[in-house]
Amino acid sequence: MVRISMSISYLWGMVASLFLMMPAYSADVPASPSPAPIEARNSVFINQHPDQFNSWKATSEQSERHDALAEDPYMVILWAGYPFSRDYNKPRGHAYAITDVRETLRTGAPKTAEDGPLPMACWSCKSPDVARLIQQEGEEGYFKGKWARGGPEITNDLGCADCHDTASPDFAQGKPALTLSRPYAERAMEAIGKPFDSASRFGQQSMVCGQCHVEYYFSGKDKAVKFPWDNGTKVEDMEKYYDAISFSDWTNTLSRAPMLKAQHPEYETWSVGIHGKNNVTCIDCHMPKVKNADGKLYTDHKIGNPFDNYGETCTNCHTQDKAAMQAVVAERKTAIQELKLKAEEQLVHAHFEAKAAWDAGATEADMQPILIDIRHAQWRWDLAVASHGIHMHAPDEGLRMLGTSLSKSAEARTKLVRLLAQKGVTGEVKLPDISTKEKAQQAIGLNMQQINAEKQDFLNTVVPQWDEQARKAGRLN
C-alpha cells in the first residue's frame, strides 16, 4: 500500500511538473489583426484605377451653381429660422463636396474649433476622411464637437474610400470591393432587413449610394447621424418615428411649428419606384459601363444624368429613342413642379396665418393641432422636393406625397380660419412682398449683408489655416 501510494504521488508530481512546463498558449494566441488604415487621399489610387479616377475627377466639370432660393423664394419662408433659409443650392459634382460645405452660409463662420452653429455630423457625407476619422476615433469620438473641429481633418472630396474597401486585395486586383464605410448606414440597412454582407451585387451597389443619398437626422447630445427607418422608409413611416420621439429639426419662427427638414432621400424614393422595384440600381443609370481608349470596359465615375450616356444606360431596358424618353421625363417633371408650387403656396399662407393667430392671442392649446398639421404637411412636401430626381425615381410617390401635403395644409388653414375668427380676425391675412429671395429673407428678419460678410471673412482667414494644417499632417497631396 505504501509503494502504491508513493507511485501515485510520484505520478501526480510528474503531471504537475508537465503543466508548469507547458507554454501558456492562451497568452500567445495572436490578436485579430487591426484593419488597415483608411487612405482618404483619392489621388493615391490613380495608378491602380486610372480610368475610374479620371472619370471621377471629371465631376469637377459639373461646376455650375443653381440658386434654388432665387428660383423659388417660397422656400425661404418655409425654412424661416433654419439655415436653409440663408442659402440652398442645387447639387453639383462630387468634386465640390468639401468646397460647397465650407462655402455654404448654412455652416456659418466659426472662428475656433469650438465655435459655430452646426455639429461634426455635417461632414458625414462629404469625404473619405470621415471614414478615416471614424476608424481612428470610433463613432462616439468622431461625432463629438462642432463642425469646425473637423476643418483641418476633413479635406479630401468624396471619393474612393467612401464606397470601396481600398485596402483589400480585391480592390488592388481591379474589383469593386464595395463597402459601407459608415457604420450608422450599415445598421440602418440591417434595420430594414437588408444586411450589406448578404445583399446581391445589385443591392450593394445601391446601398453604397444610400449611405449618403438618404433621409437622416442628428441624434442625442453628440448629434450622431441616424436614419429614421425603425418603422420603415416611406414618408408616413418616418413621420411616425419622428413624432414618437418628439423630434424636430427646428421651430419655424413665423408659425412656431416644430418642423422636420428632409435631407436627400433618393434611396427611399428610388426603392418605391419602378426602377427600385426591378432592382435597376443607381449605378445602372448614373455610372454606366463605358469603354476607354483601348476598348476596355470600366465603370464611369463621372456621376451624372443618364441622358448624357443614353446608349449605355436607358437603352439597356428601353426601346424608345432618346427624344421620346426625354419627353416622358419632362412631362413627369412638370407635373411634380406644378403640384410642388401649389403645396408651397398653401404652406406659406399657413405659416403667416399661424403667426397672425399667435399675435391675436391664441394659446398653446389652441395652436397645437394646427402646428402638427403644418409640420406633417411640410414634411411631405420636403421629402418629395428634397429627392431631386423624384420625377424619374418615383413620380407616382412624389405626386402622392405632395397631394397629402396639400390635404394637411388645407386642414391647418381651415382650423386657422375658425381660430382667427374667434380672436376677432375676420379678414384675409396679407402676405408681405416675398417675390424674390432677398425680399423673403428680409421678411423673416435675416441680415444677409452681415451673414455674407462673416462668411467671407471665414473663407479668407480660417479655411486657409485648415488646408495648411492638413498639408503639414500629410492629409492632402
Curated annotation (Swiss-Prot):
Cleavable signal peptide: 1-26
Residues that, per the record, bind Ca(2+): E215, Y216, K261, Q263
Primary localisation category: periplasm
Residues annotated as binding heme: C122, C125, K126
UniProt: heme c 4 binding residues: C282, C285, H286, H393
Protein's cellular compartments: Periplasm
GO cellular component terms attached to this protein's record: outer membrane-bounded periplasmic space
Keywords attached to this entry: Calcium, Electron transport, Heme, Iron, Metal-binding, Oxidoreductase, Periplasm, Signal, Transport
Superkingdom assignment: Bacteria
Family matches, as Gene3D superfamilies: Butyryl-CoA Dehydrogenase, subunit A, domain 3 (1.20.140.10), Flavocytochrome C3, Chain A (1.10.1130.10)
GO biological process: anaerobic electron transport chain; nitrate assimilation
Pathway assigned in UniProt: Nitrogen metabolism; nitrate reduction (assimilation)
Positions annotated to bind heme c 5: H275, C314, C317, H318
The record's free-text note on cofactor binding: Binds 1 Ca(2+) ion per monomer.
Binding sites annotated in the UniProt record for substrate: Y216, H264
EC number: 1.7.2.2
GO molecular function annotations of the record: calcium ion binding; heme binding; iron ion binding; nitrite reductase (cytochrome, ammonia-forming) activity
Pfam families hit by this protein: Cytochrom_C552
Similarity annotation: Belongs to the cytochrome c-552 family.
PANTHER family registered for this protein in UniProt: CYTOCHROME C-552, CYTOCHROME C-552 RESPIRATORY NITRITE REDUCTASE
Protein name, as recorded: Cytochrome c-552
Encoding gene, per UniProt annotation: nrfA
